[in-house]
Design a protein with these regions (language model features):
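Short, glycine-rich nucleotide/cofactor-binding loops
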Residues: 3-17, 35-41
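Conserved phosphate/oxyanion-binding catalytic-loop motifs
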Residues: 64-70
Length: 100
């Protein structure tokens, strides 16, 4: 199965991306990239637990986290990256990108 980056833009209240992620990638081949309101998936316990089951790597946009008044210590999971880190994941470590 191809390595897939899932770009998650919406909050957990708007969307549970895990169903789509399971359909298109094995958890060992999936990376979740949380941007915009998608960063809330890494800050709330239940969404973070669900995401941990379907993605090997979870990247959280530091700029989007900061724009919402939060910091890395507020995360339940994942690691904060800058846009260069997001681009590197998409271009160098995955075969395709799916926006959910």
């Amino acid at each position: 199965m191809p390595k897939t980056a899932f770009l998650i833009l919406k909050s957990p209240q708007e969307l549970d991306p895990t169903h789509t992620m399971k359909r298109f990638a094995d958890s060992q081949d999936a990376s979740a990239i949380l941007v915009e309101d998608g960063v809330y998936h890494a800050m709330l316990a239940r969404p973070a637990e669900r995401l941990a089951k379907v993605a090997k790597d979870v990247l959280v946009s530091g700029d989007d986290l900061e724009a919402r008044g939060f910091q890395a210590s507020d995360l339940k999971m994942g690691r904060v990256v800058d846009y260069a880190g997001i681009v590197e994941c998409i271009m160098e470590r995955t075969d395709r990108t799916i926006t959910v």
